[in-house]
Amino acid sequence: MARWWGGEGRGGSGTPVVVKMESPEWAISEVEAGAAAPGSPAAGGKAGRGKNARQITWVLLLKAHRAAGKLTGAASAALSVAAAARRRVAAGRTDSDDAAAAPPGESPALRARFHGFLRAFLLLSVLLLAVDVAAHAQGWHAVVPDLLAVEGLFAAAYASWLRVRLEYLAPGLQFLANACVVLFLIQSADRLILCLGCLWIKLKGIKPVPKASGGGGGGKGSDDVEAGADEFPMVLVQIPMCNEKEVYQQSIGAVCNLDWPRSNFLVQVLDDSDDAATSALIKEEVEKWQREGVRILYRHRVIRDGYKAGNLKSAMNCSYVKDYEFVVIFDADFQPQADFLKRTVPHFKGNEDVGLVQARWSFVNKDENLLTRLQNINLCFHFEVEQQVNGVFLNFFGFNGTAGVWRIKALEDSGGWMERTTVEDMDIAVRAHLKGWKFLYINDVECQCELPESYEAYRKQQHRWHSGPMQLFRLCFVDIIKSKIGVWKKFNLIFLFFLLRKLILPFYSFTLFCIILPMTMFVPEAELPAWVVCYIPATMSLLNILPAPKSFPFIVPYLLFENTMSVTKFNAMISGLFQLGSAYEWVVTKKSGRSSEGDLVSLVEKQPKQQRVGSAPNLDSLAKESHPKKDSKKKKHNRIYQKELALSFLLLTAAARSLLSVQGIHFYFLLFQGVSFLVVGLDLIGEQVE
């Protein structure tokens, strides 16, 4: 055996194998491939035993080296996270210290009350945990002490607490838990039905097809764009932007390169920037494309009210808009493909009742960090399942605010853009639906854009997306009831579109998993079954991740992060429903038919240089008058989010209490969910600012 292990085979000594461990990237397959050396069994020799054994030894050593490298990398990553957390705590910068970090429209008083409630709940849970640990040490977890037979103040107090818990707290808590479970099951059934609808669409190959393939439909005659210019309808392209210094060039360039007759489309760059330097850069970019022969205009409002809705409304009031049949909207970070109009506008031909054609979003930075990966999962499900199913079966869905083509007649018939909510896109979609207009969703037409890379930006976006629908529901509920659409469409709008998907979802997510579940740990007489805590949420997460199969490794972080975001969504839903926060009240300013801004550019001129010299100083002087003391650009910071941090400690405390009740699944869920809240509370997800 010693001779065999030493490589002294019967046919002679084996060839020594040298493996340099300094190169951990060296493939194991290279070692295994080199086994068939002269004299080895693979080569027909009998002296390969010793050599093969030695190679196996070295391969095992190489694998161990690789494993050690991976462990070192994991340890390094853990140390980096710990160092970032330590810096965050040492800096002491919280979301309450900086008003700019709070979501727009969030009431400071509401935020303070909500945070106070969470802190009080946390202190109470810590106290109850201490009491339960002391009682567990006395053995009272196995035998409930008799109130009449106990001796000692603590024993009497604990026996009284058990009685109050059993007779007064448990029934009410169990009722709330059962109610939330019912809502959870209803929402899960809705999600399952949407997935089945998407599966049916895939199996049947259902998708909108233009009735006519000529002209803009991409038919044989569409290759020669200029020759068939008469068949291409007039299209107005709008790019609303505000201080979009980073992306204005790519969005304007992508729109100006659209494959459409230049005489048949006009680009409006709607600049609401309050920074004079940014406005000058955008204006210069517009003039550059004007010199290239593109029909493009630059608009800058003097009175910037109504945010995006006000900007779009002002642009639609221009007198030349009456010459156009369709309007396309692209946000400043969107980059449409050259054939975007050819693949969307033809769907209107022969469908006079179609008011909107919506394209899908794709994301250029979906793999930037964990936050963008999780956002990609959510939005892939939104477009692939929700939008597609609602478009095919109901001809209605929420307009996404960009990458969509509107029939101008439908916009005007629905009342145009309104500044009454923070979700002007959903507002116009609901009003158009009440007027009887149909929507088409084109899943195979994609438009690239960017995802928020920092948690602060994502938090603000989600707050607006979940407060606005509740505002809109309050404003249009009576209009829905009085409208002439069918009963089923009214039911879909009220109960599915608004209540179930915009109100019930954030309500039960936060209440059930962040409040009721921890409470059941301290009041164990009220129970939440394991299938509610683990199995059904895992199944729903699996369904959500199916449209983005490459994101399957992130299914657990996705489930935990969605529950973490329920705090922001719940707070936003309450703010919008009860109109909390002064920023929600937008003043509606009516506009005249023709804009009178001094720096509004007219149609394309032959001498753009004179136009630039004459208008740029006016823009600078206007900016100086409006903002005489312009602050320098604020630096970005990572900060501590107090509500998320308080909830993390609450859930971790409840996880510790679940160990006393020997509830394994509940313990692991609370532990991982508490860690998830801790990571988000310390702003360790998303962009890290050094």
From Swiss-Prot:
Annotated positions binding substrate: D331, D333
A GO cellular component annotation in the UniProt record: Golgi apparatus
Q: Where in the cell is it found?
A: Golgi apparatus membrane
Q: Which Pfam families match?
A: Glyco_trans_2_3
Positions of the UniProt region annotated as Disordered: 607-637
Q: What class of enzyme is it?
A: transferase
The active site consists of D272, D425
Membrane topology according to the record: Multi-pass membrane protein
Q: Please give the start and end residues of each transmembrane region.
A: 120-140, 166-186, 503-523, 528-548, 640-659, 665-685
Which superkingdom, per the lineage? Eukaryota
Q: Which SUPFAM superfamilies match?
A: Nucleotide-diphospho-sugar transferases (SSF53448)
What molecular function terms (GO) are annotated for this protein?
glycosyltransferase activity
Q: Which UniProt keywords apply?
A: Cell wall biogenesis/degradation, Glycosyltransferase, Golgi apparatus, Membrane, Transferase, Transmembrane, Transmembrane helix
Signal peptide from the UniProt entry: none
Q: Do the record's keywords include Iron-sulfur?
A: no
Where is it mainly found?
Golgi
UniProt entry tagged with the keyword Membrane: yes
InterPro entries attached to this UniProt entry: Glyco_trans_2-like (IPR001173), Nucleotide-diphossugar_trans (IPR029044)
Annotated GO biological process: cell wall organization
> What exactly does this protein do?
Probable beta-1,4-glucan synthase rather involved in the synthesis of the xyloglucan backbone than cellulose. Seems to work simultaneously with xyloglucan 6-xylosyltransferase. Xyloglucan is a noncellulosic polysaccharides of plant cell wall and consists of a glucan backbone substituted by xylose, galactose and fucose.
Family assignment from sequence similarity: Belongs to the glycosyltransferase 2 family. Plant cellulose synthase-like C subfamily.
Q: What is this protein called?
A: Probable xyloglucan glycosyltransferase 1
Species source reads Oryza sativa subsp. japonica (Rice)
Q: What is the lineage of its organism?
A: Eukaryota, Viridiplantae, Streptophyta, Embryophyta, Tracheophyta
